[in-house]
Regions:
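C-terminal amphipathic alpha-helix
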Residues: 31-78, 118-160
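Sec-dependent signal peptide recognition
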Residues: 5-11
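Short, Lys/Arg-enriched N-terminal segments with co-localized hydrophobic residues
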Residues: 1-2
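C-terminal motif of bacterial Sec signal peptides marking the signal peptidase cleavage site
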Residues: 17-20
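Short, solvent-exposed, charged loop/turn and helix-capping segments
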Residues: 77-115, 160
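Bacterial signal peptide processing site
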Residues: 22-24
Length: 160
């Protein structure tokens, strides 16, 4: 009888342990849902967005530096790999940003920020495709510079 109770206790504890092991995944931007239940405060959202925009500006400025080196017998295959890594980071950052509930009154700024982020992602994707085709990519420096300026301009909206 005691042995039977022990098994029930073990089974109960085991089921509790297993129920807490499921991986929690945030909502995707495609679902149209926010991963947070409540709006962040204006300060919290400003800090969060500026952190996300910093990820974008760092990746874009790195690619701008790489474009300068491509004309100096730079390893194009290596640049494709690095640019693809940057693209993955930017896409993940965009997905996270799109699912965070903005602060009160920041809906329009959020939408503008997402457009600027998606534009940078689009330029980076085109850059990778042109690198792969061995096309001239020197024109992307200006695109990335414009993206950088747009991203830093968006950061300024949240610092007011």
């Amino acid at each position: 009888m005691i042995m039977k109770r022990k098994w029930y206790v073990y089974l109960f504890v085991f089921s509790l342990l297993m129920s807490g092991c499921a991986k929690i995944k945030p909502d995707t931007p495609q679902s149209g849902k926010y991963a947070t239940q409540n709006r962040l405060s204006a300060v919290e959202y400003s800090i969060y967005i500026n952190k996300q925009l910093t990820v974008f500006t760092n990746q874009i400025s790195t690619r701008m530096g790489s474009i300068s080196n491509l004309s100096k017998d730079f390893n194009v295959d290596n640049e494709i790999t690095l640019a693809q890594n940057s693209l993955d980071i930017l896409q993940e950052t965009y997905d996270e940003t799109a699912t965070v509930y903005p602060s009160e009154g920041d809906d329009a700024n959020r939408d503008a920020t997402l457009v600027v982020m998606m534009t940078a992602i689009s330029h980076l994707q085109s850059y990778i495709n042109d690198l792969d085709k061995k096309s001239d990519v020197s024109g992307y420096f200006k695109d990335f510079e414009n993206d950088f300026n747009s991203l830093t301009g968006q950061a300024g909206l949240y610092n007011q």
